[in-house]
């Protein structure tokens, strides 16, 4: 007999077990069993824990092996750590939704120094009392200023998308270097 050990790598099978073992005769086919893991998307069975060698269930059994489940977070959000308003007039927010809930990315109004009309406060680095406002806008922000910048509903396939926040030139700016922070909130529900 040949044996195939399937390690759920932190996930579990229907029987709440973390491992499944199948025994087959050479030439028979292994059965693919899919485990589940809270907050994660199953991304396949691999022959190694670095997930470089994906297992092919369409091939007949020839040797005993151990397979490892690869897990990916249900969602990924990419936001640049910083941008320079000297070169950029927009900030791109990217997202991938692999799960069954809706992913939304918006501004965290409690943590961001921003006006009701979505103008970001920029402070002069030499004298923080000298400030200016940089107007922000994104799709739908004119009618609903608190609207999420990016929303990805769950789909039958993995959904990917991006959205752009426009950043206008600061108003009433004086000479000097200015800095400001945007804090985003990510919801997955």
Name every feature range the model reports, one short phrase each.
Residues 46, 111-112, 136-138:
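Assembly/interface hotspot detector across virion components, adhesins/toxins, and nucleic-acid enzymes
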Residues 11, 40, 75-77, 120, ...:
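Short glycine-aromatic motifs
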Residues 2-4, 23, 45, 57, ...:
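Intrinsic-disorder/low-complexity peptide segments enriched for small residues
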Residues 4, 27-31, 59-65, 85, ...:
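Compositionally biased regions
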Residues 9, 17, 28, 32-33, ...:
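Intrinsic disorder/low-complexity segments
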């Amino acid at each position: 007999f040949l044996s195939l050990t399937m390690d759920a790598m932190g996930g579990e099978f229907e029987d709440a077990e973390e491992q499944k073992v199948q025994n087959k005769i050479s030439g028979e086919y292994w059965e693919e069993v899919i485990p589940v893991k809270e907050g994660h998307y199953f991304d396949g069975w691999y022959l190694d824990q670095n997930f470089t060698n994906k297992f092919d269930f369409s091939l007949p059994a020839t040797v005993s092996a151990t397979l490892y489940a690869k897990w990916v977070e249900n969602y990924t959000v990419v936001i640049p750590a910083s941008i320079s308003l000297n070169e950029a007039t927009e900030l791109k927010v990217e997202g991938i939704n692999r799960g069954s809930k809706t992913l939304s990315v918006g501004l965290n109004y409690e943590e961001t120094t921003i006006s009701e009309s979505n103008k970001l406060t920029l402070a002069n680095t030499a004298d923080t009392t000298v400030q200016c406002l940089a107007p922000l806008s994104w799709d739908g922000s004119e009618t609903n200023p608190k609207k999420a910048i990016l929303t990805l509903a769950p789909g039958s396939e993995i959904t990917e998308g991006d959205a752009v926040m426009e950043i206008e030139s600061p108003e009433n700016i004086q000479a000097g270097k200015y800095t400001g922070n945007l804090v985003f909130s990510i919801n997955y529900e």
